[in-house]
Amino acid sequence: TCTDPNLLMGLSVSGSLSPEEYTADLTGEIHTDLEALKLVTEACSVSTGLSLSGYVSPMSESYRADIRLSDFSALLPTSRLQTNALSISAETDSTHINAAVRSGDMAMNFVSSIGFSSFLEKLNQSLPIIATVQEEKRLDMKALHQVLPPFEFHANAKRNNLIQQYLKGMNMGFSQIDLNIQNDTLLNTTGKIDRFSTGGITIDTLQLSLFERREKEERLYYSLQVGNKPGNLDQLASVILNGFLSGNTTKLFCVQKNRQGQEGFRIGCQADFLDSLIQVSFFPKNPIIGFETWTLNPD
């Protein structure tokens, strides 16, 4: 028990130890003001009930943890977060990883077909390859895919969750979000946001996709689609951005239409990173910019 007025804490701990396994259980309450404790310089206080259980078996590389927060409340510089219940669970052995987060109408799930040690090893192998993207301005998708660990991540949320509360403090929000990321034989990501709002502007639908395709040279394709219903941002009734990353080349093509189907933009560009130079070219020869047709110089 701690009775500091800025760190009120009462915890009960129990557990067991044996050569084969360890178990632990913890319950209690925590009420703390990190700003008053001078650990941070901005408003940050947390109050919650806590229940934690853990299991470790080193011989079988088996680990399990369940964390449950009740009557959780947090005051942050830009927002206040509150929920009756937040649960985090994870378990792994030498063959798999499972993890989940639940709170309100928010759900996140993560799975992998390899154990935690192998997962971390592959992540460490991928870091140098990711670093070379910045250093050499080149994406080696084949090499990256070979070292990325296999996994699946799924997340969805509506209006009653901590994400919404956090975004509200920044004058942002949405009605529903779905995100799926998978790395198996190929990397694939899809996402959709309904009624995304920021700064008084609302976009009815945002759809994102990111996927790997094996051709002459492995490419990472991306696509962003914006759609708005009649009466909302009619000049941006439809916006589609498509492109890919491959080696030292990236390509982007944009088509924007108004409610009447007129094209406000139809233009693409390709950027080639050559040592210390960036070579940029535009297409097609007669792009549409600002609802008018233009002619590009041959150079």
What are these regions (language model features)?
Residues D140-L144:
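Surface-exposed, low-complexity/disordered segments
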Residues V147-P149:
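A short, polar/charged loop/turn motif at coil->beta-strand junctions and beta-hairpin connectors
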Residues T1-Y22, T27-E61, D66-E121, P128-K137, ...:
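Hydrophobic lipid-interacting interfaces of membrane-associated proteins
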